């Protein structure tokens, strides 16, 4: 007769559940399958028919007592291990969520180590890891905790020693600045408001090379937008956006057009970017406490160089009475003739138009041949400007170049680096891909081009972006500029006079007044912060 004996491992005592959990954990953590196999209870035990039941009682303990195999000892009471104060030395990566906010401002870098690896207790220590959800980045803790302490008897592998930081070389040099602000540097107190004081710049000007000062302020050497570089003559449309006659000269098309410009900065020239007229009158010297005699002397020397350049290289004697608003206004009358061997002094331009009465207010003349000769001159002016816009010294020659460099240095010292501050703002705008500088001045077009070249502004003002408001006024020039770049662009007017302010107000353009050095510094600061 078979005798069914209930194994002691099925006792109702809680020791079995605890012991099974410990063994299961050991099997998962240490990979000891043998110990787990030994703990499987034998539900049915078949007694040998020849062995009396009394003999088996000597091998079995009394009912209700806990029985363990020889390979597994009773687990000691559970030991609660505190979470280490220092987690592993891999900080949570900054995960950019859909709300475009960095939820880990305390990250010190992409790769960093803690001071050392904390010594882990027996078993697996808890570790933290970032959990990404729709609400952001959270710091969660893994649920792996030590369930029981195991001695060396239960481990197939020896314990691992702790590692120090000194074994590993740094990925970055000590001078590496992390891209994020560490948590220790974050200020817990409210931020205080700082007052910025504009310090007066030194009056000395560093020595420049013989080829500098013409374009050394230009910090942008990359390709420019067509409104900056390649907005030349177009076969069907003039630069002001109005339909004109088809020109026979075809320039290479630019990859982008004027309608792609997003922001247009319309500048005044005198007393805004440069100091010129107030030097001649002594107004600048009296306002800033400078020597009036020196101011007038520098102003007269600069005026002489401006008109000398305009007469010698830019046909000002021929074009003074036939002034244009824009250099391309008469390009439709140009037949594209090669001018490399053309003799401007003997083409009969003066004999055809001996008096100013033959040149109307808009530069239009009744004769087609005379208009073609006029267009030839403006085309040569454009070629000269584009060739020497960054090398004025090569245009005026070596003897005059030294005088020009010395005059520029004296001018900067007298005006407290006014032009240097202006060029900082101009170069910031010029470096943007979809922004452009446009110049509108009350000076005649040819002298205005000479001013731009001699003051070293050719790198930030292409000749296509220079307008003369001598005859029509600045408001009319603003309208032409808006027709050229479109209504979608944002226009910002920068100047010092009432005329540009009223024109900007009429066309709902923001106006930035320049009256002192602080205004130029504030403009540059606003551009750096991309407020403009």
From Swiss-Prot:
Q: Could you say which cofactors this protein requires?
A: Mg(2+)
Any stretches that span the bilayer, and where are they? none
How is the co-factor bound, per the entry? Binds 1 Mg(2+) ion per subunit.
Which domain of life, per UniProt?
Answer: Eukaryota
The answer on whether this UniProt entry bears the keyword Cytoplasm reads yes
Question: What EC number(s) does its UniProt record assign?
Answer: 3.1.3.48
Q: Which Gene3D superfamilies match?
A: 3.40.50.12350
Tell me which residues this entry annotates as catalytic: 268, 270
Keywords, alphabetical:
Activator, Chromatin regulator, Cytoplasm, Developmental protein, DNA damage, DNA repair, Hydrolase, Magnesium, Metal-binding, Nucleus, Protein phosphatase, Transcription, Transcription regulation
The answer on whether this UniProt entry bears the keyword Repressor reads: no
Q: Name one GO biological process term.
A: DNA repair
Chain segments carrying region Disordered? 202-258
Knockout mutant characteristics: No visible phenotype. In contrast, mice lacking both Eya1 and Eya2 display complete embryonic lethality, due to severe defects in muscle development, including the absence of the diaphragm, the absence of ventral hypaxial muscles of the trunk and muscles in forelimbs and hindlimbs, similar to the phenotype of mice lacking both Six1 and Six4. While Six1 is normally expressed in these mice, it does not activate transcription from cognate promoter elements, and does not activate transcription of Pax3.
Q: Which reaction does it catalyse?
A: O-phospho-L-tyrosyl-[protein] + H2O = L-tyrosyl-[protein] + phosphate
Which is one GO molecular function term here?
histone H2AXY142 phosphatase activity
Tissue occurrence: Extensively expressed in cranial placodes, branchial arches, CNS and developing eye and nose. Low expression in lung with little or no expression in skin, liver, intestine and kidney. Predominantly expressed in the upper one-third of the oxyntic mucosa and in most regions of the pyloric mucosa.
Q: Where is the composition biased (Polar residues)?
A: 205-224
Compositional bias segments (type: Basic and acidic residues): 228-243
Q: Where in the cell is it found?
A: Cytoplasm; Nucleus
Q: Which NCBIfam families match?
A: EYA-cons_domain
Belongs to which family?
A: Belongs to the HAD-like hydrolase superfamily. EYA family.
The subunit structure is: Probably interacts with SIX2, SIX4 and SIX5. Interacts with DACH2. Interacts with GNAZ and GNAI2; this retains EYA2 in the cytoplasm and prevents its translocation into the nucleus and transcriptional activity. Interacts with SIX1. Interacts with CAPN8.
Main function: Functions both as protein phosphatase and as transcriptional coactivator for SIX1, and probably also for SIX2, SIX4 and SIX5. Tyrosine phosphatase that dephosphorylates 'Tyr-142' of histone H2AX (H2AXY142ph) and promotes efficient DNA repair via the recruitment of DNA repair complexes containing MDC1. 'Tyr-142' phosphorylation of histone H2AX plays a central role in DNA repair and acts as a mark that distinguishes between apoptotic and repair responses to genotoxic stress. Its function as histone phosphatase may contribute to its function in transcription regulation during organogenesis.
**Name of the protein this chain belongs to:** Protein phosphatase EYA2
The source organism is: Mus musculus
């Amino acid at each position: 007769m078979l005798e069914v004996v209930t194994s002691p491992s099925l006792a109702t005592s809680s020791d079995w559940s605890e012991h099974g959990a410990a063994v299961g954990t050991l099997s998962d953590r240490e990979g000891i399958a043998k110990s787990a196999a030994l703990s499987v209870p034998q539900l049915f035990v078949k007694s040998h028919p020849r062995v009396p039941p009394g003999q088996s009682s000597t091998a079995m303990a009394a009912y209700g007592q806990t029985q363990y195999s020889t390979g597994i000892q009773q687990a000691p009471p559970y030991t609660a291990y505190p979470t280490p104060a220092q987690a592993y030395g891999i900080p949570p990566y900054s995960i950019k969520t859909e709300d475009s906010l960095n939820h880990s401002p305390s990250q010190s870098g992409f790769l960093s180590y803690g001071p050392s690896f904390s010594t882990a207790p027996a078993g697996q220590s808890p570790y933290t890891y970032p959990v990404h959800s729709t609400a952001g980045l959270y710091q969660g803790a893994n649920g792996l905790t030590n369930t029981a302490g195991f001695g060396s008897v239960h481990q197939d592998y020896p314990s691992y020693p702790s590692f120090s930081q000194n074994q590993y070389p740094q990925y970055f040099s000590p001078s590496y600045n992390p891209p994020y602000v560490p948590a220790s540097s974050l200020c817990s107190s409210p931020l205080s408001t700082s007052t910025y004081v504009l310090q007066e710049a030194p009056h000395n000007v560093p020595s420049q090379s013989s080829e500098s000062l013409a374009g050394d302020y230009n910090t942008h050497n990359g390709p420019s937008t067509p409104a900056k570089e390649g907005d030349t003559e177009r076969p069907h449309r003039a630069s002001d956006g109005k339909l004109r006659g088809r020109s026979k000269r075809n320039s290479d098309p630019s990859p982008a057009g004027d309608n792609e410009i997003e922001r247009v900065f319309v500048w005044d020239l005198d007393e805004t970017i440069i100091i010129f007229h107030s030097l001649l009158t002594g107004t600048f010297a009296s306002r800033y406490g400078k020597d009036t005699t020196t101011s007038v002397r520098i102003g007269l020397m600069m005026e002489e160089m401006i008109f000398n350049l305009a007469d010698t290289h830019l046909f000002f004697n021929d074009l003074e009475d036939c002034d244009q608003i824009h250099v391309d206004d008469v390009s439709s009358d140009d037949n594209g003739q090669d001018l490399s061997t053309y003799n401007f002094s003997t083409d009969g331009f003066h004999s055809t138009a001996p008096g100013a009465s033959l040149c109307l207010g808009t530069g239009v003349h009744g004769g087609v041949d005379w208009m073609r000769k006029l267009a030839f001159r403006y085309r040569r002016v454009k070629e000269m400007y584009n060739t020497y816009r960054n090398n004025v010294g090569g245009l005026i020659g070596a003897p005059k170049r030294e005088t020009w460099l010395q005059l520029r240095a004296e001018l900067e010292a007298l005006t407290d680096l006014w032009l240097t501050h202006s060029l900082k703002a101009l170069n910031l705008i010029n470096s943007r891909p979809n922004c452009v500088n446009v110049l509108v001045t009350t000076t005649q077009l040819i002298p205005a081009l000479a001013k731009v070249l001699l003051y070293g502004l050719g790198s930030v003002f292409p000749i296509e972006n220079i307008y003369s408001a001598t005859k029509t006024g600045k408001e009319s020039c603003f309208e032409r500029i808006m027709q050229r770049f479109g209504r979608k662009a944002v226009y910002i007017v920068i100047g010092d006079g009432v005329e540009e302010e009223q024109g900007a107000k009429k066309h709902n353009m923001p106006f930035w007044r320049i009256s002192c050095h602080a205004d130029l510094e504030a403009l540059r600061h606003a551009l750096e912060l991309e407020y403009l």
